[in-house]
Amino acid sequence: MRKDETSNTSPDISVAQPASALRYHLRPPRRNDGAAIHQLVSECPPLDLNSLYAYLLLCEHHAHTCVVAESPGGRIDGFVSAYLLPTRPDVLFVWQVAVHSRARGHRLGRAMLGHILERQECRHVRHLETTVGPDNQASRRTFAGLAGERGAHVSEQPFFDRQAFGGADHDDEMLLRIGPFTHPPH
């Protein structure tokens, strides 16, 4: 059994919905989750859909810094891709946060981010960085909420302007930097 296939002893999180409560198991992605993650991201506009191969590589090479939210029926309704920056290993860079529409509005994205930060492999992380488009208010709320939970500051600066995307119809990407993380969440 591979390291990322071992049982996860962290508790499931409850995500309350108006008429019921769904329980999601948060765990590192496995190699065989790649296709389901690719499908999930395709159903989560405005996220950029990467190749299936890219998601397979994330599952294989970065499982320790990525997470899936799995429903009791085994459906993947959430995914966060992230990695430690090679030149600054105390910085976790979050690439994508995908939450299916059926699971939105219950802070699942924030819970998945917190789950990654609590892993042993990320105990040394002092900052989280991510990029967001200027109009992506849902992502901005998620990251602001995470910063508030952890008593951290959020700063913003330009990262990629639209010209960097080679003429593709793409918004500017702003870099959000959250940290430093000085204490566990309350």
Swiss-Prot record:
Highest taxon in the source lineage: Bacteria
This enzyme's EC code(s): 2.3.1.178
Matching CDD domains: NAT_SF
One GO process term, biological-process aspect: ectoine biosynthetic process
Recorded metabolic or biological pathway in which this protein acts: Amine and polyamine biosynthesis; ectoine biosynthesis; L-ectoine from L-aspartate 4-semialdehyde: step 2/3
Database matches in NCBIfam families: ectoine_EctA
Protein's name according to its UniProt entry: L-2,4-diaminobutyric acid acetyltransferase
Gene from which this protein is expressed: ectA
